[in-house]
Amino acid sequence: MTDVSMQRILLDTNVLLDYLLHRDDHAKMAEAVMELGAKNNVTLLCASLSLKDIAYLSSSAIRREFKPNESEVENFTRSFLSSRVPWRCIEQVKEMCDIVAVDESTCDKAFSLQKRHRDFEDNLIIVAAQQSGANCVVTSDAELISHFPEYCKTPAEIVAALE
């Protein structure tokens, strides 16, 4: 049964990366958030600034995993994957989520949160979520959760609310 207060949730970059790149033990919980969100007609949101991080970090993950070597075939494959995987990750996010713009107003409001939380990028996520009418931000960032406990939830908390 869906928690009525969870109809619009913004996914932090770390949760999206966990899902897309199947990162460690966080991937299963991120996948559960996506599945339960879809099953319960929850609108999943993504801040536009997360897209550039997803593109960069997914390409970096490929390059880190597959180091250049003497094999022409392996080097071609590495180059091919590092150029294609980021685009596919962005496509997947766009299929799953509504993209929320980050504009000058978002930046100004994020700047005003610096006494509460010193990470400007995180503050952009918080403000983008608020401006889009999101009920919460789903994140694995413990510090962000501790600074915005009323607004930030772990993937496990969202799964519990949506089951």
Task: Label every PLM stretch briefly.
Residues 1-49, 57-67, 132, 146, ...:
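Short, well-structured N-terminal submotif of metal-dependent ribonuclease cores
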Residues 13, 48, 104, 122-126:
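Conserved glycosyltransferase catalytic-site signature
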Residues 31-117, 149:
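PIN-domain endoribonuclease scaffold, especially VapC-family toxins
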Residues 28, 108, 126-127:
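A broad detector of short, well-ordered amphipathic alpha-helices
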Residues 11, 46, 102, 139-140, ...:
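A conserved hydrophobic position in a structured secondary element of the catalytic/binding core
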